[in-house]
A protein has these predicted regions:
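Long, internal low-complexity/basic segments
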Residues: 22, 139-143, 149-151, 159-229
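Non-transmembrane alpha-helical segments in soluble domains
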Residues: 49-53, 57, 70, 98, ...
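C-terminal cap/loop subdomain of S1 sulfatases and analogous C-terminal strand-loop tails that border
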Residues: 7, 56-145, 183, 200-202
Length: 229
């Protein structure tokens, strides 16, 4: 069992801030899992499929990025050192691309396009909250955001441009790029990102839903890129 990804508020559902990505996970499969245990290590929803495959006695394809949680329960491995997150805003009308990575204390967010965050704007306009000092930061976020989740759990103080946090920023960014390479992420290519960005912004009125046989152009582009690799 996992919950939905946060409340429908600014910086919550649909975003990659903690209130939109940190959710409970419950496993109940006796006797395959120990009962009454609480795992404090980090896991991800990408671990669900490998877990189910192993429980069913099916081999786990090597290309899957997740791992079976049975290994965690049996003490064969520790929780993840890094958790990766990503969003496009879930629909063209809410489009905003964000990449994220966190370790047990720090989180780095990469916003490749410095423009209005349509997802954040929609959540704000439809809420009854009064404007405050944090509104501008999530409506027009910096290219990089770095947060100390221990001392700043609500992610308000951006440390990404402070000299003393430069090494942590570089470490997390390198790990993010490494993971993208490992999973053959088409968005590792800036050209692919630009195509997708332009395409989504052109369809914000979602009129494509009325077009018979409509196909997103970026799908063919990404397939071609994978074949060429």
């Amino acid at each position: 069992y996992i919950s939905d990804h946060g409340a429908d508020f600014p910086r919550s559902k649909g975003s990659i801030y903690e209130s939109g990505t940190r959710i409970p996970m419950i496993l109940n499969f006796p006797p395959r899992f120990s009962s009454g245990t609480v795992e404090k290590g980090m896991v991800s929803t990408i671990d669900i499929l490998p877990t189910m495959l192993q429980a069913a006695g099916i081999g786990i394809p090597k290309q899957l990025p997740g791992f079976p949680l049975q290994e965690l329960d049996q003490g064969a491995r520790e929780g993840r050192k890094y958790i990766h997150t990503f969003t496009t805003g879930s629909a063209p009308a809410l489009h905003f691309i964000q990449f994220g990575i966190r370790d047990d204390r720090y989180k780095l967010i990469y916003n490749p396009y410095r423009r209005k965050n349509l997802l954040a704007a929609s959540r704000y306009i439809n809420s009854k909250l009064s404007q405050d000092q944090h509104f501008e930061a999530f409506l027009f976020p910096d290219e990089f955001e770095l947060y100390d989740l221990l001392n700043d759990p609500y992610e308000f103080k951006n440390l990404a441009y402070l000299v003393e946090y430069e090494n942590k920023k570089i470490e997390l960014l390198q790990r993010m790029r490494q993971f993208q390479k490992e999973i053959n992420d088409p968005f590792l290519s800036k050209a692919n990102l630009d195509v997708f960005e332009k395409e989504q912004l052109a369809h914000q009125k979602i009129s494509y839903r009325k077009k018979a046989g409509f196909n997103w152009p970026h799908l063919d582009l990404f397939r071609k890129a994978n074949i060429e690799k």
